[in-house]
Amino acid sequence: IYPAEPERDFIKTALGPALHRNGYQDLKLIAWDHNRDLLPQRASVLLNDSAAASYIWGIGFHWYETWSGTRPLYDNVKQVQQNFPDVHLLFTEGCQEKFDYSKINDWALGERYADNMLHDLNNGITAYCDWNILLDQTGGPNHVGNFCFAPVIADIAQKTLHFTNAFWYIGQFSRFIHPGAKRISSSSNRSDLLTTAFINPDGSIANL
């Protein structure tokens, strides 16, 4: 993994100045773009340096810290948001690994998306992006054999599309939480019931 200090120095001495010098200062520079496990440490090194921080619009992260058997480290997102409230936090990649066509209807697929989205939204993220919206019936194509699930699976031979439950889970969020929405307080009366709420620019309230 690219260490924090070289990334910081590259941004403040090379990439950031080059973008500004060539008229691209309006581009939104997203740093890190890896898993939640090292998110606080990486953000601290990058954002506590005022020169580097002046070029950084946001910090991106993924959900693959669970590869080692750990639970999702949602509190790391909250910690960074509290320490650097003016920096945008973005979930930039996530997918269900180890594709198995016989499991494309498993509820665990959509539930993983919902669990991650609810926790990360409540911890202050700005945006959420899936990795692959569409893959084929092998979970590819992929040049290194990293075959994964996707919200939509295309059966090339049959020329059909299968919309997994992940597609509808993600759609539930994107349908009701509009661009420019602001998160508002929400709570549930059960410890295992997750919820989040937003007020949209038109004044409507989305409670998921």
Regions found by a protein language model. Give the residues of each.
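Active-site neighborhood of glycoside hydrolase catalytic domains
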Residues: 1-97
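Short, solvent-exposed polar/charged micro-motifs at secondary-structure junctions
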Residues: 38-43, 101, 140, 193-196
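Extended hydrophobic-aromatic, low-complexity segments
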Residues: 71, 139-141, 208
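A general structural signal for short secondary-structure junctions and capping/turn motifs
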Residues: 80-82, 118-122, 197-198
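Aromatic/acidic polysaccharide-binding cleft in carbohydrate-active enzymes
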Residues: 88-172, 183-188
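Carbohydrate-binding surface patches
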Residues: 175, 186-208
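Glycine-centered loop/turn motifs
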Residues: 178-181
